[in-house]
Amino acid sequence: MKKIIIYSIILILFLNCRDKSNVQPNLEEPVVAASSNAQKINSTLQELLRFADISETNDMDVADVVGFKMMDVRGNITSLDLEDGATLFKSYPSSESKQNRPIMEINDSNKVLLMVKGKGFGGPIWAKLLMDATTHEILKVKFEHKAETEGYGAGITRASFQNQFIGKTIKISNNTFALVQNGKEWIKGEQPIDGISGATVTSENVVHMLNEGLLGYAQYFQVR
């Protein structure tokens, strides 16, 4: 009888030890966390970060690097989370309303990314601008369009046209840019811009878009 009890105890201990040896460590949680963080960098955020010359890393928390805001038509500024901020930038060019202007601030710097939009000869045109919010200098610009004519209005995407705006300091009380086309000043302003040959309408609309769009951010610059 005693032997049976002893054998039973040994068997129970053996089975218990074997069960514990089969327990696998939970390796899934860190993977889930990393995946969740990676999802924050969607395609729109990637585009904005690259335009702002921000290098992406696998462990980067975007919220530590940039912050999004929105300015309404009255100049009221509201903070947005990453998803809402990226969505506003993505939808802004195709939206007919200019009431809510997107802002992306680069943390621990004076840099800010803004967007302006207008109408070209063939359809919507828009631009992203990387600026120094303190000096009001344009650091980088990228024009885009939906249906401008190749060889003419589509030339707004050429570096030779875009580079005219880089390094210019904007005015927040009147027109920054003037348009000069075929020796004639079509739009009055502080900084002359050479229009694209054969694309006077598109050139005019780009300059109007920048002048009016940047003036629309005047209250943002005033509170910086």
Label for each model-derived stretch:
Residues 13-16:
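C-terminal motif of bacterial Sec signal peptides marking the signal peptidase cleavage site
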Residues 2-8:
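Sec-dependent signal peptide recognition
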Residues 18-224:
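Flexible, solvent-exposed loop/hinge segments and secondary-structure transition points
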Residues 8-9, 138:
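A ubiquitous, low-specificity "background" feature that marks scattered single residues
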